[in-house]
Amino acid sequence: MGEILELTNKNFMSHLKKDITSQESLKSRIEDKNGDVASPKEDNYPLLNETAAWPDGVITSEEGCSSSGEKENSGLCSEESSEEDPEEAEEESARAFGELVAVLRDKDIPLNVLDEPQMKDWLEKYTGVYRSSWHG
């Protein structure tokens, strides 16, 4: 049984590495064609618009602040905010988890890998975000 779990973990990590490599390759091809890359944040989340289920009215920090200079100046969109709203943190956690599940399904990786102790580490690596609610 331990060998199966180890193989599953290796397969998962292999899929993640291939995904990252293919995204980097795509990004460089887009740069070569257009001389510019669309949005690096969008490249990090390729399934964001296709498979993630969003509650109505939720605006991510990228959407809410990317085009409005006055919001940034008012401090509402500061990336260095000292405290995060618990509801906002929970929404972000749910969004990141939903996106991770979508990637696993897309890569035909069994969802039971999320039951593994390493799930929290994978989630943090994939999103680049630490959430205490994932550790709890």
From Swiss-Prot:
Top-level taxonomic group: Eukaryota
Low complexity bias spans: 61-79
Location of the region described as Disordered in the Swiss-Prot/TrEMBL record: 23-44, 56-95
Protein name listed in UniProt: Putative uncharacterized protein YLR125W
Biased composition annotated in UniProt, kind: Acidic residues: 80-91
